Amino acid sequence: MSDYFDRVERQIVRNVEAGLPRASRRPNVSGYLAIAAAAVVVIVVAGAFLLARGSSPNPPPAASHSVTVTFKATAIDSKAPVGALDPVVAILRERLDSVFPGVRVSRAGNEIIVTAPKANAGTRAGILALVTTRAQLDFYDWEANALTPNGKTVASQLETQDPTAVAISQGSGNGAPGGPFAGSMKLYDAVTLASKQPPRASAVNSRITPQYWMFGAPGSAACEAAAKAGGTVSTAGQHCLLNGPYDNRHALLTGLPAGVSPSDGQILVVPRGTVVLQAIPASFSNPTPIDDPSAQFFVLKDNVAIYGSDIANPEQRSDPNTGTPDVTFGFSSKGKREFQNVTANIAHRGDLVSSPGQTLNQHFAVALDNRLITVPFIDFKQYPNGINGDNGADIAGSFTISSAKDLATILRYGPLPVTLTVKG
């Protein structure tokens, strides 16, 4: 267990040092998601998303020392982090105390200090994972928002059977919708496509600011310097991510890798109304960082159908059929309406684009912190008018009781209003 935590800790720290989004999480990919007869949506993810005491069948080593970790707060959507830190302290206390009883959380200026008085080999990695997870959960109509390289939505090209649109919608080969190589792109290509989109400011956007990225040219000295600073090797023939994403240019140009100056990179700006989401990975046993050459991405119009704030009462339960731990939640009154509406629209479109010899079920996508968790389909024949949200949803996967409780806790208290990255 300690080896696993150590590996994850190294990955998180490497991401932090590169100035990248934190706490990569890995879903359990099992192909298309079945919609249960009782109309309960089962969202398959990995319990390995949350690293916590008890997430292995082997008990952790006995606690023998204290661990203190300091985190720096970065504003989200240009809000001053200082004013947002009081609720952050309360949220983190709730998150951490269920996993590490007795943990102390305090603030000093723009920093959050977490101390676990009784620590073992996995404590620091567990704290990193729980604290650096913002837990912003968003639901999208997949085909209505996913873009192909020509900038058009998948939905608008299904009747003409555009090959890339069909691959993104229905999967390709062994790749399920939302997974790597099912119409996905490398990071630079995805961000370039996203940067060419017009601003689409809307009340249903997941963020209210542009997003700034910096890339180095293939084979450039900047890529070599960034790879050296991160303890990796640059990939020949590919653009490298030097920094980002951030919501302002100043943050992007601060904390560049050693040996990289602001003039060394290409800055791409993704306007409000467009998002870049990392694909569902083929394997979740080893987290793939955003700057890994094998990482794949999709570009979507940022029209959120249901927010994480629209879910209610997330709890750790046991699947009645298998006995395995999972996380259940209901929807708020607004969430129920929106879930019915979006699944109805998806079902109607599936009926429209299908033909007697070809069924093209359509999908919704669930993203957690800009990473796709799953892209399940709606069976338009079984649910022609969508799915009633009264029965809520069930997140099932490779959970232990402890890790299922962790996810329920994180969802219960909502996303952090700031991004927290480890200091030092």
Where do the model's predicted regions map?
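Membrane-interface helical sensory segment of bacterial ECF anti-sigma factor regulators
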Residues: M1-D3, E17-P61
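A structural signal for conserved, well-ordered secondary-structure elements
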Residues: D3, R7, Q11, A48-G424
